[in-house]
A protein has these predicted regions:
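Short linear motifs at protein or domain termini
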Residues: 1-115, 240-251
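C-terminal all-alpha effector/ligand-binding and dimerization domain
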Residues: 2-11, 21, 186-251
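Amphipathic alpha-helical repeat elements characteristic of tetratricopeptide repeat
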Residues: 27, 103, 126, 202-206
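Short, hydrophobic secondary-structure boundary micro-motifs
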Residues: 45-46, 80, 173-177, 193, ...
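Short, flexible turn/loop "capping" segments at secondary-structure junctions
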Residues: 79, 157, 203-204
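A ubiquitous short alpha-helical element
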Residues: 90-96, 114-118, 143-149, 191-199
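Conserved amphipathic alpha-helical segments that form helical-bundle/coiled-coil interaction surfaces
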Residues: 119-190, 207-214, 222-234
């Protein structure tokens, strides 16, 4: 039997709550390691030595390997020729590929979602938008980039985009969308930090509001066009950040 632990709910920090849940040790390590990858605790391409991970997250090598293999399936880490693991590198080409694939998947899912939309779907979407707006205000008001605020913002951001396509009635589309979201999150989070530092002008809140308005109006064509433009603008910001000289990007 796999060892189990009591751990804070995955969304507890984002919600400001203190709930706990019973999960396997492997699941706990997976969540902690994935969170740290998203927060930039490990550099792209960095080797992940099992002993160092054991010291950082606890447990034996077996649940650590389980967590790493799960992250490998999500393309967060890659294997090396010596059967080790390292953080997956970041590249403009991969980011663009993920972005364009995400547009194909999410725009199709959005059109289907709007065709099936009802009052309950609209209520969830409006609620997700307001929760996202609140999280964005808290994150922007913080005197410095705060990991907990950024985690909460990312959780609310994902929930809004999930709500948009939530009525598509296709588990495959929803699953593929979630995978692609995770891939773009790896790029988007460090890019947000750099964009804040260098003052890239973009009102993402207005983009989300326009998406909400088009979706609530059941205007599938406009909503899909806005979603594609939203993703491509994000890709352009990320590409500019990745193209900065190494020293400047790390400043």
């Amino acid at each position: 039997m796999k060892p189990r632990i009591k751990a804070p709910r995955e969304d507890a920090a984002a919600d400001g709550g203190a709930g706990v849940e019973d999960i396997t040790l492997s699941e706990h390590i997976y969540r902690q390691l994935r969170r740290d990858i998203m927060r930039g605790a490990f550099a792209p391409g960095q080797s992940l030595r099992l002993e160092l991970l054991r010291q950082r997250y606890g447990g034996s090598f077996s649940p650590i390997r389980e967590a790493l293999n799960r992250l490998r399936s999500e393309r967060m880490v890659i294997t090396t020729t010596s059967r080790g693991f390292r953080i997956a590198p970041l590249s403009v080409e991969e980011m663009r590929d993920a972005c364009e694939t995400r547009i194909l998947i999410d725009c199709d899912a959005l059109r289907r979602s709007l065709a099936n939309a009802d009052d309950a779907w609209e209520a969830r979407l409006v609620g997700a938008f307001h929760a996202l707006a609140l999280a964005a205000r808290r994150a922007d008001a913080a005197p410095a980039l705060d990991p907990d605020h950024e985690d909460a913002l990312e959780a609310r951001h994902q929930e809004f985009h999930q709500a948009l396509i939530g009525a598509c009635r296709s588990p495959w589309l929803l699953d593929l969308s979630a995978q692609l979201y995770a891939q773009t999150e790896r790029y988007r989070r460090p890019a947000r930090a750099q964009a804040m530092a260098y003052g890239h002008e973009r009102d993402v809140g207005d983009e989300h509001r326009a998406l909400l308005d088009a979706a609530v109006a059941r205007d599938a064509g406009r909503a899909a066009a806005l979603l594609a433009a939203h993703y491509r603008e994000t890709a352009q910001v990320i590409e500019r950040i990745l193209s900065l000289p190494e020293g400047q990007a790390a400043a």
